[in-house]
Structure formats: structure tokens, C-alpha cells
Amino acid sequence: MDRRVWGALGTGAGLAAAGAAYATWVEPRWFALRRVEVPCLPSRATSVRVLHLSDLHLVPRQRVKRAWVRRLADLRPDLVVDTGDNLAARDAVPALVDTLDGLLDVPGAFVLGSNDYFAPGLKNPLRYLDDSHDRPVRTGAATPGQHGPGPADPTDRGRLPTEELLEALTGRGWVDLTNARARLEVAGLRLELVGVDDPHLEYDDYGVVAGPAADDVDLTIGVTHAPYRRVLDAMSRDGAGLLIAGHTHGGQLQVPGYGALVTNCDLDTARASGLSRWWPGAGSTPSAEAPDDAAWLHVSAGLGGNPYTPFRFSCRPEATLLTLVPAR
């Protein structure tokens, strides 16, 4: 083998090592604030700013992430919507409350994700590429009238302190939308919010909250952790004008010029993150073909990930400031 071949192999190995180091140590800490305008309000409504947080997967030692999220309070949003997966460690709730402290003084609403119930575990990242991750994870039926599987056994190391998390968030005034409906008046607008428990664990019970959007509000917002089609279809069919979700991590590893390879649910990869349109039966139909009355869908790429698979490439961790404006 001549020197040119050895040189090419060495260059390739060096680039691969550099890419792996970047995806492990640089991009996961390179947080981005996205600003997105959503034309979903009635014609005479004033604009309202909604900060969408998702998938913090917080471990107390993550000082860079915590400092960045704290500064989001300086944006002074009108409303905060948190689409779940807040925790990645059993001792993370106090750190989460400290991190969100300024934002907890703002009106807020939230739903839960799987990593608000169960601690993350070691997984082969290649498993996310098979079709099984398009389907929900079966963990056993949710307990009627309770969140997910019900109260955690303190001796179960696989369970996270869900009750402590709920008390911390609702104790500061945020609204729990887990299989629930609520109304908020924000910046002079009357908002109806409809949420479900995590569809990825099949804890969603949309039947509890199903029904037409109220006719005496300015906007109905559907909130879910995992954007499974069945939930998006039901919410948009009932008249929600805006759907907000997380869970996908934006695919976490994107191919430049192509985009996400996976969504970890049955949502198409073109909608893995960002703003798109959704309507009942949309499936993988492009947003450009949406009917005029289609809902707007925002999926966050999230702020974190499973600590055992911390990689990101071409998919920076993010929070999004959604400015809701009158429809054009």
C-alpha cells in the first residue's frame, strides 16, 4: 500500500474522529434560540409570544445548559409551554426548579414525557434506525385518573420522582395539561389548551379531553410530548389551531442537505423539527398541500438527550420563541 493510500486512510480516520468529537462535545452544548412567527390568531388579535421548551433531560451537573436556559427568562415571554422529558436523573428536580426559576414566574403549561416517569438507560444508538421506533413503547396501561403508571415506588431505581416534579411545577402556577383541558388569559388573549399524557408510552387518553374547540376563545392549542399521528389527527380534527410537541430531538443526527433520518415516532422526518402544517390524515403529505384550515404544528428539537447517547450533528439543541400573530 503506497503513501497516498495511507495518507487518505489517515485523513479519513482523522475526519471521522473530529466529527465524532464535535457531535459529542461541541454541538450538544451549542444551544440555539429559534424565533418563529406563527399566523394562527384571529384578525384583530394582538400578537403573543410563547416560549417552547422541550426535552431538557436534565442532570444537575449540566452547568452550561442550566445557565443558558436561565437566561431565557430575559426574553419575557407571555407564556411558556414545556412539552416534557425534563429529567435524566432522580436528583434533578431541585436543579430543574432552579434552572427554570425566572420562567416559573411567567404563565406556563406542561405535559409529561417518558423521561419524567422513567430514568434513561443505555441503548444502542443504531436501534433508533429500525422501524420499531415508529411505534409506541408498551410499558403497561396507564392508571385511570393518575399520571402514567401512578405513584413511583421510592425503591425502584428505574422510576423518576414524578410527583415531586408535578408539585414543583404546579406549585409555581404552571398548568398541568396531562390528559387535561385548561383556559388561560395571556396578553389579553383567551387561550384554550388541550393536552395528553405521553403517547410514546401509550399513556395518552384523548377521550378524556376530546371535544370541539371552544367558540369563545381566540385560539385552541394542542400540547403533547410525542407527536404521534393519532394524537395530532384528533386534536386538529377538534379544531386546535396550533399543535406543540417535542420528543423527536429533531432526529438528533441530521444529514446536511437532507435532514433527519428518524423521529422516534410515526411522524414523517420532514416534520422532525420546526414549523409545518397538520390536518387529519396528513400523514407524509407536504405542508405545501395543506388545506386552508390546517393547524400549525411546531416540533422542538429539544435542549438535551439521553445522557448515554448525547450525540448531535447538524441539529443543535434549541428553545423556540413562537410569536403568534393574526392569520394572513
Regions found by a protein language model. Give the residues of each.
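Membrane-penetrating hydrophobic segments
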Residues: 1-12
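Acidic/histidine-rich helix-loop elements
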Residues: 47-66, 86-89, 118-132, 157, ...
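Active-site neighborhood of phospho(di)ester-bond hydrolases with catalytic His/Asp-centered motifs
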Residues: 51-54, 79-85, 107-114, 177-179, ...
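Core catalytic region of metal-dependent phosphoesterases/phosphodiesterases
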Residues: 64-185
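Short beta-strand/loop segments at the ligand-binding rim of alpha/beta enzyme cores
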Residues: 212-223
